């Protein structure tokens, strides 16, 4: 196998046994693909499909005027280039967006003839549309945001029941609901009396037949739709009915049923079963005489006209009187509805009988009254309202997804129409749709069919960025449409252009609102690469059109069988959002309809193929899916007699030939974060949940350290997160320094006519959203060959292209003097000295100079009443130097604000006129370092309002940026010239000269001669061969063009920098100062492993006091062994043992290198590690000796191992590795007390565990209040660090003081220290005067209590006096 640039340097031994059928997909595709399809930017306007933006425009245009004489048509849209790139937008605090222009055609028709009179086409500016960065984020107002995908109920039709909770009888009431993508909901529901009702948009309920009447059906038609008819014959005074034996099955015989000979087949009162049915069929019975009573309560199926013209209406209940009328009226035959109590209920007929509306108009009026209560109904209004509810494509859209789900649920065939017309037709409801839903509901009530499970992932779909932006865009366009319609009638007369008609503000506002303040547009979690990736792969059930925390029940939050391979069962927040916010599984993706799919291998006749098929939860129904680790022989046949499979949501065992699919990978079930936990299969799920969540809070350490025990997913996460620099094309490293890499691209990857230079500028010490530090470090060397996709530089928390969130620590599981009580962690001072858990945090402090009523604020070093020492770190412009070390209270930016003019005496005026004394009328409002902060200034940015003169500092910053850019361009041109020179020498070599340059006519051009000449001289040579001369001219022209292009780029950059910045109104200048703070680990900081084993650092011990082994090697960290059994996360122990083996092997390799063993011996030892102890085999023979030495050098700190989730290392393999590393197979070591040198009683588990430092640092939490703000109502101090609040002295603390009888302390707590307003001012004064005397008064909360009681109507007064 071929190794990449970084893999060669450090191969991770993989214990996985299962073959890799497919690589993990690109992890951000759900975001990137969704937005790409929405914009369709790369496609030409002619080839754009009807999706995304195109669909939004198509659905609103054409817009016609009310008279129909003018119309606006949409032709195409185009996106311009964004003004600034992503980094510039983040610095300037602007939005990364592209201007959108839309070509609109205005058509004006002649009023009389309706022929086209005039056509005008014009491009209209429609505002800016935010662009997605290549890593799936948006930059909105300078901050990176993520749009989280939403998991919502799919449009379609759903059948459900209330589980007997609505009615006191406990009767199960069924209901059906049609949910469109946009428009009114239509619900049908049964009540306890078995009548069917309808609700529109959850309004007051109506009888369902009202809607059927409104659709234009009469009684007979309605009965016809829902029931079969049963003919009744009146013959010689007795009634006969057609006998269909199958229909009678299950009914109770109300009379003896006899055959033609009079032999009884079924006795009265017996239930008719299958045997009786067979006997009746054998007897050949076709008619059955029935007594009159049998027909009582039956229902007439149609109107029956008697002799005398009297009509017995359809849906009449037969009774003795009606039967007599029928007999007298000479009716020989009539139809009744076939109903019974078992599976043919008379629900619709009963509802129809209860319905008081007689015709369509009455029904429409009834619906109008419900929808618009209080408005007087007119015939037209009622008609329009009903039509607009479900039958107008403007107001109602089921969407292709909804139509697919609808037809599928009702068992109809489904083909989706792609063109706009068929989309509109399929988007609205038809009469048949409504009838079919009602019919299905009645059948479910009759006991046929099942209700739906709304938590099934076939009934929930994912709405991603693209779709949500499209919806917002449509909302904006609809607002535009309303305004345009008003103006179009003017356009007919006033000769307006499209530009005059369209006001794009509503569109821009809708988009801005969505990206800026929607619940699903979130501030990106940028703690580390993993937290970024997880945030982008999150699916939330909350948000607009979704659930709310309070309403969501237990079922919605629970793990459902369809989550398998689609949504992670582990990773979800603890707390009120549990189960509502989920994470996509590693291999999951959303299909075109938005349903989540997961890949499976196809299995044919018990043989597993390599064909991979993505199945959604809907398609998975009925399949039989084997586990990824099912036993398979070398030909791919399943070998077990019964294979463990998943079928219909159950785990069962089936023979191999029944199996249809097989899992692709063992990691398929879990999300990215969970798949990074080694030995996840040995951890309790609750702890694994904490582990996945805490990995996202890990702070990038100063030097990233790859995990010794990983899972093999680390490289994928680092690569896909976008924090590393990845080579776009292969080539040779031409130049490299700390902040840039220049690559000369391979010839075969170059596009004709380009320089073949790729320049990568690295991000250095930049602030992330969470104030952690983003910094990239080069890992390539000059002259190295790299291929496309290789990692060139590591980002934060990555090491050689692998995710590295923490540090490998030598841990011992033992108690140590109570310092690890309750999960506390005891650390060694060595960790501190080596800066292993030190992180850099960057704070942004900004100073804004505004234009005030009294004059402009000024940024200056001339500050009144400030000593020389305080200004020592500022330059002439009053801005701090880069590199200055500042502490709390230091001035960063000097700023003065004008004060109100005071009345001056004439003498003062004179003095001021003479000496120009101006200091008195300004006050110091400088930006100072906040309390509790100290650090180094690493960057300063100055933004000046357009039209104001820039100060020296701003100009210096601008110059530095230009110089850096010029350097890039020069580098590019230099490589370009070198490439051209090589090409020219290749062309001229061996040719004959025609003179020119330093050659004479007839000279043979040798390589020695040519290689001594510069490019300019080479291009002057005129070769005899004209074809070559032509090529030389081309190269010359090309170089000129390139030079001009580079000059133009530089000029453009200069123009960008020279223009002022767009600042908010009233702001003249903004100075941003970036402070870097180094945070070492200290007691009170929170740390954790990857298995949910979290704790707080309790103490940092000197190295000499730490427990050590017989060789004197001390441990780094002491953990409490009692934290393991009750929490059931045994994975950490296995990780510790395997980590010990990895480190031991590294030590052995280091020893071999020190002893300068031969490469052959090294090869043999590496072969033992990689290929003898199980797992994936590595091809070490493909590496050269130099590469083997480099590899061994990188393995000295430990051999990195991968134990994939659910397919990891076995106990025996861990023991074998320990043995190979010359460590006891038990993994336990005898330790000695560092203080006394005594041996501890029994061997201790010592090994290497990967420990993370979490972003819960004691520095951010330490807080003390002196005097601060108070709550308005209760007058008590506020709570929390952000409000500068006090410590709450709660109910239980009061009990404690009461128990101690500390009366005065208690009085002080409840009065002057809290809410006794007068008392606290008095005591403050007393303390200032040095008189420590307390005079408590009435607490404000007592007054609040009395007011509260009075508000209940009880008068309460406090009597003062005796």
Curated annotation (Swiss-Prot):
Catalytic activity: RNA(n) + a ribonucleoside 5'-triphosphate = RNA(n+1) + diphosphate
Protein EC: 2.7.7.6
GO molecular function (one): ribonucleoside binding
Gene Ontology CC entries for this record: DNA-directed RNA polymerase complex
Biological processes, Gene Ontology terms: DNA-templated transcription
Alphabetical keyword list: DNA-directed RNA polymerase, Nucleotidyltransferase, Transcription, Transferase
SUPFAM superfamilies xrefs: beta and beta-prime subunits of DNA dependent RNA-polymerase
Top-tier EC class: transferase
Transmembrane segments: none
A Pfam family of this chain: RNA_pol_Rpb2_6
UniProt function note: DNA-dependent RNA polymerase catalyzes the transcription of DNA into RNA using the four ribonucleoside triphosphates as substrates.
Subunit structure: The RNAP catalytic core consists of 2 alpha, 1 beta, 1 beta' and 1 omega subunit. When a sigma factor is associated with the core the holoenzyme is formed, which can initiate transcription.
NCBIfam families in the cross-refs: PRK00405.1, rpoB
Family stated for the protein in its record: Belongs to the RNA polymerase beta chain family.
UniProt-recorded name of the protein: DNA-directed RNA polymerase subunit beta
Organism: Acinetobacter baumannii (strain SDF)
């Amino acid at each position: 196998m071929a190794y990449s640039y970084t893999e060669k340097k450090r191969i991770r031994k993989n214990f996985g046994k299962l073959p890799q059928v497919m690589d993990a997909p690109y992890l951000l595709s759900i975001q990137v693909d969704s937005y790409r399809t929405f914009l369709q930017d790369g496609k030409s306007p002619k080839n754009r499909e009807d999706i995304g933006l195109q669909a939004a425009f198509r659905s609103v245009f054409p817009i016609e005027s009310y008279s129909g004489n003018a119309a606006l048509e949409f032709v195409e849209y185009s996106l311009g280039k964004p003004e600034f790139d992503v980094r510039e937008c983040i610095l300037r605090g602007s939005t990364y967006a592209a201007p959108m222009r839309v070509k609109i055609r205005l058509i004006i028709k002649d009023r009389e003839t309706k022929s086209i009179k005039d056509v005008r086409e014009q491009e209209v500016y429609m505002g800016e549309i935010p662009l997605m960065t290549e890593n799936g984020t948006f930059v909105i107002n300078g901050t990176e945001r993520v749009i989280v995908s939403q998991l919502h109920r799919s449009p379609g039709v759903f059948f459900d029941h209330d589980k007997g909770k609505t009615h006191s009888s406990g009767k199960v009431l069924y209901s059906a609901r049609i949910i469109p993508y946009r428009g009114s909901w239509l619900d049908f529901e049964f009540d306890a009396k078995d009548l069917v009702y309808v609700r529109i948009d959850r309004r007051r309920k109506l009888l369902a037949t009202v809607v059927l009447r409104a659709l234009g059906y009469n009684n007979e038609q309605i009965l016809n739709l829902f029931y079969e008819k049963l003919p009744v014959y009146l013959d010689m005074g007795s009634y006969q009915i057609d006998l269909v034996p199958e229909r009678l099955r299950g009914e109770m015989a109300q009379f003896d049923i006899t055959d033609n000979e009079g032999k009884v087949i079924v006795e009265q009162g017996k239930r008719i079963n299958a045997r009786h049915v067979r006997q009746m069929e054998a007897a050949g019975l076709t008619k059955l005489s029935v007594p009159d009573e049998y027909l009582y309560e039956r229902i007439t199926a149609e109107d029956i006209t008697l002799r005398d013209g009297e009509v017995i209406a359809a849906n009449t209940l037969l009774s003795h009187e009606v039967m007599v009328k029928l007999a007298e009226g000479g009716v020989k035959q009539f139809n009744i509805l076939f109903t019974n109590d078992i599976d043919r209920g008379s629900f619709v007929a009963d509802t129809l009988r209860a319905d008081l509306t007689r015709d369509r108009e009455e029904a429409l009026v009834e619906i109008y009254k419900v929808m618009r209560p209080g408005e007087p109904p007119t015939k037209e209004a009622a008609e329009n309202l009903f039509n607009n509810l479900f039958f107008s494509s403007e107001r109602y859209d089921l969407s292709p997804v909804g139509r697919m789900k609808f037809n599928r649920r009702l068992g109809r065939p489904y083909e989706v129409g792609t063109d706009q017309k068929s989309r509109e037709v399929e988007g609205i409801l038809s009469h048949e749709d409504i009838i079919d839903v009602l019919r299905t509901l009645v059948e479910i009530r009759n006991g046929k069919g099942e209700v739906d499970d709304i938590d099934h992932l076939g009934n929930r779909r994912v709405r991603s960025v693209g779709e949500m932006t499209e919806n917002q865009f449509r909302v904006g366009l609809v607002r535009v449409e309303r305004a345009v319609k008003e103006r179009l009638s003017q356009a007919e007369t006033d000769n307006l252009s499209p530009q005059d008609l369209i006001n794009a503000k509503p569109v821009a506002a809708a988009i801005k609102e969505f990206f800026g303040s929607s619940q699903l547009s979130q501030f990106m979690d940028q703690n580390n690469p993993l937290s970024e990736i997880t945030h982008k792969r999150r699916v939330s059930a909350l948000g607009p059109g979704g659930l709310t925390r309070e309403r969501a029940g237990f079922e919605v939050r629970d793990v459902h069988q369809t989550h398998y391979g689609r949504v992670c069962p582990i990773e979800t927040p603890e707390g009120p959002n549990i189960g509502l916010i989920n994470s996509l599984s590693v291999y999951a993706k959303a299909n075109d309809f938005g349903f989540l799919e997961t890949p499976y291998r196809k299995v044919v006749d018990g043989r597993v193929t390599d064909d991979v098929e993505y199945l959604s939860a809907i398609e998975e129904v009925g399949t039989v899916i084997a586990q990824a680790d099912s036993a398979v022989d070398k030909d791919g046949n399943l070998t077990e007699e019964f294979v463990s499979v998943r079928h219909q949501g159950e785990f069962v065992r089936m023979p191999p030939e029944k199996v249809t699919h097989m899992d692709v990978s063992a990691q398929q079930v879990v999300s990215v974060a969970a798949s990074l936990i080694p030995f996840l299969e040995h951890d309790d799920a609750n702890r694994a949940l904490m582990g996945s969540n805490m990995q996202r809070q890990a702070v990038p350490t100063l030097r990233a350290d790859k995990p010794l025990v990983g899972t093999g997913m680390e490289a994928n996460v680092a690569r896909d997160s976008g924090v590393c620099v990845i080579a776009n094309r292969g080539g040779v490293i031409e130049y490299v320094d700390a902040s840039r890499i220049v690559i000369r691209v391979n010839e075969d990857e170059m596009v004709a006519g380009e320089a073949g230079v790729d320049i990568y500028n690295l991000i250095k010490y930049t602030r992330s959203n969470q104030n952690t530090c983003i910094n990239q470090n080069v890992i390539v060397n000059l002259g190295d060959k790299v291929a496309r996709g290789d990692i060139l530089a590591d980002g934060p928390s990555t090491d050689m292209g692998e995710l590295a969130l923490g540090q490998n620590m030598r841990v011992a599981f033992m108690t140590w003097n109570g310092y690890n009580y309750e999960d506390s962690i005891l650390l060694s001072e060595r960790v501190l000295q080596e800066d292993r858990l030190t992180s850099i945090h960057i704070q942004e402090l900004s100073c804004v100079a505004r234009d005030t009523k009294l004059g402009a604020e000024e940024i200056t070093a001339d500050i009144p009443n400030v000593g020389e020492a305080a200004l020592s770190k500022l330059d002439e412009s009053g801005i701090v130097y880069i590199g200055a070390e500042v502490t709390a209270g230091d001035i960063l930016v000097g700023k003065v604000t004008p004060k109100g003019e005071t009345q001056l005496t004439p003498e003062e005026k004179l003095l001021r006129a003479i000496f120009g004394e101006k200091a008195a009328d300004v006050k110091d409002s400088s930006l100072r370092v906040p309390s509790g902060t100290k650090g180094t200034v690493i960057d300063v940015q100055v933004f000046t309002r357009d039209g104001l003169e820039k100060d020296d500092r701003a100009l210096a910053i601008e110059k530095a940026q230009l110089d850096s850019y010029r350097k890039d361009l020069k580098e590019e041109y230099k490589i370009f010239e070198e490439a051209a020179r090589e090409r020219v020498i290749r062309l001229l070599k061996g040719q004959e000269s025609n003179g020119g340059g330093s050659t004479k006519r007839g000279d043979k051009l040798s390589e020695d001669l040519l290689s001594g000449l510069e490019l300019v001289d080479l291009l002057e040579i005129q070769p005899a061969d004209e074809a070559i001369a032509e090529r030389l001219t081309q190269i010359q022209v090309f170089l000129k063009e390139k030079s001009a292009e580079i000059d133009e780029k530089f000029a453009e950059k200069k123009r960008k920098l020279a223009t002022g910045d767009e600042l908010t109104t009233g702001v003249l200048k903004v100075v941003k100062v970036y402070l870097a703070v180094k945070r070492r680990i200290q007691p009170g900081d929170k740390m954790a492993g990857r298995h949910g084993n979290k704790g707080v650092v309790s103490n940092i011990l000197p190295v000499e006091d730490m427990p050590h082994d017989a060789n004197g090697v001390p441990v780094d960290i002491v953990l409490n062994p009692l934290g393991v059994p009750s929490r059931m996360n045994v994975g950490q122990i296995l990780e510790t043992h395997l980590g010990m083996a990895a480190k031991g092997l590294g030590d052995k390799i280091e020893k071999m290198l020190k002893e300068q063993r031969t490469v052959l011996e090294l090869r043999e030892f590496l072969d033992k590690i990689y290929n003898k102890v199980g797992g994936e085999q590595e091809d070490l023979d493909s590496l050269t000796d130099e590469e083997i030495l480099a590899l061994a050098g990188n393995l000295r700190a430990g051999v990195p191992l991968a134990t994939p989730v659910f397919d990891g290392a076995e106990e025996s393999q861990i023991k074998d590795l320990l043995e190979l590393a010359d460590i006891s197979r038990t993994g336990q070591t005898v330790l000695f007390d560092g203080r006394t040198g005594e041996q501890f009683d029994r061997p201790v588990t010592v090994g290497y565990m990967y420990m993370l430092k979490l972003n819960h640092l004691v520095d951010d939490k330490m807080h003390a209040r002196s005097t601060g703000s108070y709550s308005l109502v209760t007058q008590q101090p506020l709570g929390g660090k952000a409000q500068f609040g006090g410590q709450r002295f709660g109910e239980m603390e009061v009990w404690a003081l009461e128990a101690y009888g500390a009366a005065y302390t208690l009085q002080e707590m409840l009065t002057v220290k809290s809410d006794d307003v007068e008392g606290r001012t008095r005591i403050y004064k007393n303390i200032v005067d040095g008189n420590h005397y307390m005079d408590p008064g009435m607490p404000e909360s007592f007054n609040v209590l009395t007011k509260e009681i009075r508000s209940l109507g009880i008068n309460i007064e406090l009597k003062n006096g005796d």
